[in-house]
Amino acid sequence: MPASAMTDADYHALAARTLAHVEATLDRWLESDVIDIDSQRTGGLLELSLPGGSKIVINTQPPLHELWLAARGGGYHFKAIDGTWRDTRDGEEFFARLSSEASAQAGKALDFSS
């Protein structure tokens, strides 16, 4: 759905599914001995602690209907377009950006999209 047509309920549902997907991916990786990334969720904020001490923060921004990502490589803002989070600057999809940032910080290929 276009960003302009998103209701508060739609935003909260999509944001919750997105954070839950990230957490489920981290749990799957831990169980499969892929990588141990600790996560801590406080409301709409999810903090990932990667090996080596670096962090990635994913934060919901309900008033703006955005999802923000802060990583070593920079800060990114995402808006939902047709049900997919897209970077407001270059249009990159959220999970693709998260995967590239996490891979760079972890020193190994990680894919959050599946």
Regions found by a protein language model. Name each.
Residues P2-S114:
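N-terminal intrinsically disordered, cationic/polar leader segments
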